[in-house]
Amino acid sequence: MADPKGSTSKDGLDDWCIVEAECSDVDNDLEELFDRDTDSDISELLDDNDLEQGNSRELFHQQECKDSEEQLQKLKRKYISPKAIAQLSPRLESISLSPQQKSKRRLFAEQDSGLELTLTNEAEDVSSEVEEVPALDSQPVAEGHLGTVDIHYTELLRASNHKAILLAKFKEAFGIGFNDLTRQFKSYKTCCNDWVLSVYAVHEDLLESSKQLLQQHCDYIWIRGIAAMSLFLLCFKAGKNRGTVHKLMTSMLNVHEKQILSEPPKLRNVAAALFWYKGAMGSGAFSHGPYPNWMAQQTIVGHQSTEASAFDLSEMIQWAFDHNYLDEADIAFQYAKLAPENSNAVAWLAHNNQARFVRECASMVRFYKKGQMKEMSMSEWIYARINEVEGEGHWSSIAKFLRYQQVNVIMFLAALKDMLHSVPKHNCILIHGPPNTGKSAFTMSLIHVLKGRVLSFVNSKSQFWLQPMSETKIALIDDVTDPCWVYMDTYLRNGLDGHYVSLDCKHKAPIQTKFPALLLTSNINVHNEVNYRYLHSRIKGFEFPNPFPMKPDNTPEFELTDQSWKSFFTRLWKQLELSDQEDEGENGESQQAFQCSARSANEHL
């Protein structure tokens, strides 16, 4: 019978539990093999002793040094190539620079960070290059010392900041900073007539030859050489930019562009002007030509510019009045162009209130011109305006155009005469007709020659849109439409009658004035409109029914120019009853010119 499953009594417990394992030869061999391969002491599983790093740190340091050295060599090959040395001189390729690996090894031994080591190494390289430059003598470079010139080349090539080296050498040679004599131009394309140049390591023979070669380019030359530095002040006959100046000097002196410092001189610095002036009188400098104006103004006693008095506004107003400059921009620009010849313009440019003087000048000129216009009759005004027209034309072109438009010339002359003389209810002429018939061209040409004003109904929302009528002898409203006719029929009847009206002007109280001669152009024949019947007796109309003729080359068939109107008024002067001014002109009576400045008649110009 089989043994029962499950637990047995306590008495049979010892038989069920295996107390000692059975051993065999195979088991013993595997156990021994396992024990030999994985033998360990459990008591020494954790090692609490201090670890020794060994040479891993030194290995890492050597790897960082190697990488830094490779990066440095790549940068040197990139920025200090043999091609750059060959451009300066072929002899420089045979010159070996002083080794600096020794200092690099010391730096590597003292530093433990690759980044700090590289930065410190580069800083030390720059400082060592600057410190190793030998002191310059105060005597010029002797002839034949080609080795010294070559040394200057190598020193400049070794410098990472060649401009700083040149500035330091310049100050050591001349005792004054280069920036103390010059003002800076950032752009290479900015033109200037005067340039200051400092050239490093110029051969003495080339320096002497440049004194003669530069005379064909410059009005004034100032050259001085001390040790390896040569200083030039060149006043060119024409404005040049920095690139053009460098190209000229590199070809003339056989130098590289890196050897040149160039900036314009300071023009309003007395100390800088005295440096050039005293240097020109010394024996060590070469000068050719008259002193520039900016130097003479600040150094020579009794110079014409130093004798100029303070700015005189009345002289500026007189100049603008004589040249008919009314716009502020024209006055400012044209008067500034007079600065080299006019002492008052120089004083104005040196003043801090230039804009205020320009505004006051423009205002005063407008006041004088308006007063002069009001004093003149229509005959005098027309005579003065046509005398300003240069050239000759023929009045027949205007007469032919009127006949082409089927306008009776006699009737037009009668209406024009009444308008110019401001006859009540006859001082307004309307030119109407289809589009492209030459209405605007005809009236605009007349307004242009008589210096009239043009009014635009687009400004009718402003209560000052009629203000130009108080400042002219003849006015024009071009392309009158229905809204404008309604406005004229409502508000401008008294003005068209030739009576005094109250005209609102900006920045002043309303003034009492009469409307000047008025020209109108429109596509609407107001005489055919019943709604504007009150304007029929106040406006004289002429119709232009035919299209404006053009030549095959797209030029007008009829020349409506200032010269044509000049001939028109001259030819029909008596018919228009404009005889007063012409009679005075034929009598040869002299007229005194208007003077608005405080200058006396006997004062020198």
Swiss-Prot record:
It is an enzyme of class 5 (isomerase). InterPro entries: Helicase_SF3_DNA-vir, P-loop_NTPase, PPV_DNA_helicase_E1_C, PPV_DNA_helicase_E1_N, PPV_E1_DBD, PPV_E1_DBD_sf, Rep_E1_papillomaV, Znf_lg_T-Ag_D1_dom_sf. One of its GO terms (molecular function) is DNA binding. It comes from the Viruses. One of its GO terms (cellular component) is host cell nucleus. It is found in: Host nucleus. Residues 145-308 are annotated as: DNA-binding region. Residues 580-605 are annotated as: Disordered. ATP binds at residues 433-440. Keywords: ATP-binding, DNA replication, DNA-binding, Early protein, Helicase, Host nucleus, Hydrolase, Isomerase, Isopeptide bond, Nucleotide-binding, Phosphoprotein, Ubl conjugation. There is a cross-link at residue 514 (Glycyl lysine isopeptide (Lys-Gly) (interchain with G-Cter in SUMO)). A motif (Nuclear localization signal) lies at residues 76-78. Its main location: host cell. HAMAP family: PPV_E1. ATP-dependent DNA 3'-5' helicase required for initiation of viral DNA replication. It forms a complex with the viral E2 protein. The E1-E2 complex binds to the replication origin which contains binding sites for both proteins. During the initial step, a dimer of E1 interacts with a dimer of protein E2 leading to a complex that binds the viral origin of replication with high specificity. Then, a second dimer of E1 displaces the E2 dimer in an ATP-dependent manner to form the E1 tetramer. Can form hexamers. Interacts with E2 protein; this interaction increases E1 DNA binding specificity. Interacts with host DNA polymerase subunit POLA2. Interacts with host single stranded DNA-binding protein RPA1. Interacts with host TOP1; this interaction stimulates the enzymatic activity of TOP1. This is Replication protein E1. It comes from Human papillomavirus 20. The gene is E1.
